């Protein structure tokens, strides 16, 4: 497959996108009585309302031509086939094999690895490690953000084990867990693709020392390795039955579907984890089969590119009106910004348009009393998303959940409609875009579909920008410099400011 297939056609399509007429959201609703049905997509137990975005038939036609110019169908097919679309690292991209999509051999391998994970979970449940109440999961980046999201969202009330996820190398993070967990009833899962990640290995060593200090006879025998480098885990003395591999071709930010999801599978039970996978697979089918104008990830990417490239928006906000999804914005920060925060295209040339949004967000209704002032009356355009479950899971007075939902819907309406006032300080300009994503209830299948939606949206944005969404070279330089400072703090090659900081704190 060519890297940038037809630059002239892509440039022409972008010009057509930029030339589309500008209308307010109110005008778009007034001119099209079918707008709501045209821009609402229901799939995989989720309801996406894109009608409060400035998309219309003219823009959709232009963006579909851009898809064609970018050879989108072929690139999507290559993604689903697990081909080597990570061209800068010459790697296949195979996280979707965990959900049953890809080369038959890769799907079979994923099933084998899932079976190993299930066997270990059943052994833990059966008492193979004695009485187990706690799991300490140690990882960083994608090895921690995904499991942490799943556990916080799905196991607050029904978790079978008490799971803590530690990613920060700051010792206070581990100490907080040590205060709460009984070391004799704790297992430790160490998640690292290479099984050499410096922060993760340091935290794992400290966890082993904690167990030894409290008289655990065989701390190593209570360690579980989640890795794409099982040989390295074996070298450290971890028995094969406690090594849960995943494929080298699975990137960290796409890895929660693999053995990296072990802590969530342990806490949820295997059936719950399987439902998560099935939800992701349902969104896969939708993304592959639905026409662009009724395809949720594609429509979301169209809106992203319109607001970024045409309207100059630099950020987008994710606001979950569900306390259990408070970690979703942090998870999406890595997914979107590490994937598409690039400056060169597939041919190594500087890209012509802004790359990924800065992703941020919060939880409603808290965020309304913190950041919505800027969203309603500030000078920056910030497309936002509201995410909510129709049914409550708490046992309190139903007025709690009703108030939560009414606030979410009211914010979207207010952002769109605005309100005039003789006093400029009390005037709301309106015409500010939002997308609302609803689910009947927050369950593993719905969360799996939601995460897969964001994955496919991120991929589509990458194709439209002509970039590789699956490498992350931008994280390397800082790590290299950290090693250099640790090994040679006296090094005179650093800038004057950094040398002064080293002198003040590290000598």
Swiss-Prot record:
Substrates-to-products reaction catalysed: alpha-D-glucose 6-phosphate = beta-D-fructose 6-phosphate
CDD domains according to UniProt: SIS_PGI_1, SIS_PGI_2
Lineage: Bacteria, Pseudomonadati, Pseudomonadota, Alphaproteobacteria, Sphingomonadales
UniProt similarity note: Belongs to the GPI family.
UniProt enzyme class: isomerase
Pathway, per record: Carbohydrate biosynthesis; gluconeogenesis; Carbohydrate degradation; glycolysis; D-glyceraldehyde 3-phosphate and glycerone phosphate from D-glucose: step 2/4
Pfam family, one: PGI
Organism of derivation: Zymomonas mobilis subsp. mobilis (strain ATCC 31821 / ZM4 / CP4)
Biological processes annotated in GO: gluconeogenesis; glucose 6-phosphate metabolic process; glycolytic process
Classification via InterPro entries: G6P_Isomerase, G6P_Isomerase_C, Phosphoglucose_isomerase_CS, SIS_dom_sf, SIS_PGI_1, SIS_PGI_2
Transmembrane stretches, start-end: none
Function as written in the Swiss-Prot or TrEMBL entry: Provides a gateway for fructose into the Entner-Doudouroff pathway. Catalyzes the reversible isomerization of glucose-6-phosphate to fructose-6-phosphate.
Localisation: Cytoplasm
Name this polypeptide is given: Glucose-6-phosphate isomerase
Active site, renumbered: 338 (proton donor), 369, 479
Main subcellular location of this protein, as a coarse class: cytoplasm
GO molecular function annotation: carbohydrate derivative binding; glucose-6-phosphate isomerase activity; monosaccharide binding
């Amino acid at each position: 497959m060519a890297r940038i297939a037809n630059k002239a056609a892509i440039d022409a399509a972008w010009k057509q996108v930029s030339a589309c007429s500008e209308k307010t959201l109110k005008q778009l609703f007034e001119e099209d009585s079918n707008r709501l049905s045209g821009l609402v997509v229901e799939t995989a137990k989720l309801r996406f309302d894109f009608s409060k975005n400035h998309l219309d038939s003219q823009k959709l036609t232009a963006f579909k031509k851009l898809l064609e110019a970018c050879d989108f169908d072929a690139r999507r097919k290559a993604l689903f086939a697990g081909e080597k679309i990570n061209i800068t690292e010459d790697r296949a991209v195979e996280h979707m094999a965990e959900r049953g999509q890809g080369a038959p051999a890769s799907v079979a391998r994923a099933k084998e690895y899932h079976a190993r994970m299930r066997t270990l979970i059943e052994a833990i449940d059966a008492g193979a490690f004695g009485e187990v109440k706690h799991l300490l999961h140690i990882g960083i980046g994608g090895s921690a953000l995904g499991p942490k999201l799943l556990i916080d969202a799905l196991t607050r009330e029904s978790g079978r084990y008490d799971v803590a996820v530690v990613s920060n190398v700051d010792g206070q993070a581990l100490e907080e867990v040590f205060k709460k967990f009984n070391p004799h009833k704790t297992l430790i899962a160490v998640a690292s693709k290479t099984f050499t990640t410096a922060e993760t290995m340091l935290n794992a060593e400290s966890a082993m020392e904690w167990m030894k200090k409290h008289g655990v006879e065989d701390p190593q025998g209570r360690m579980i390795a989640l890795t794409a480098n099982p040989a390295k885990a074996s070298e450290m003395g971890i028995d094969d039955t406690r090594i849960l591999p995943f494929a080298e071709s699975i990137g960290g930010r796409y890895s929660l579907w693999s053995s990296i999801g072990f802590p969530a599978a342990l806490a949820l039970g295997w059936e719950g984890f399987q439902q998560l996978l099935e939800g992701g697979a349902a969104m896969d089918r939708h993304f592959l089969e639905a026409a662009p104008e009724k395809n949720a990830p594609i429509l979301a990417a169209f809106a992203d590119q319109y607001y970024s490239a045409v309207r100059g928006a630099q950020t987008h906000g994710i606001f979950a009106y569900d306390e259990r999804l408070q970690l979703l914005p942090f998870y999406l920060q890595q997914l979107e910004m590490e994937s598409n925060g690039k400056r060169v295209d597939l041919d190594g040339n500087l890209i012509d348009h802004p790359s990924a949004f800065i992703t941020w967000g919060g939880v409603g209704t808290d965020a309304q009393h913190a950041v919505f002032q800027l969203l309603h009356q500030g000078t920056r355009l910030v497309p936002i998303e509201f995410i909510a479950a129709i049914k409550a899971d708490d046992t309190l007075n139903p007025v709690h959940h009703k108030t939560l939902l009414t606030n979410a819907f009211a914010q979207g309406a207010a952002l769109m409609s605005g309100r005039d006032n003789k006093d400029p300080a009390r005037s709301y300009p309106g015409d500010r875009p939002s997308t609302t994503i609803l689910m009947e209830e927050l369950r593993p299948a719905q969360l799996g579909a939601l995460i897969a939606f964001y994955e496919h949206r991120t991929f589509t944005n990458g194709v439209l920008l002509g970039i590789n969404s699956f490498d992350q070279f931008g994280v390397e330089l800082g790590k290299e410099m950290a090693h250099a400072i640790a090994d040679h703090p006296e090094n005179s090659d650093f800038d004057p400011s950094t040398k002064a900081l080293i002198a003040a704190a590290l000598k």
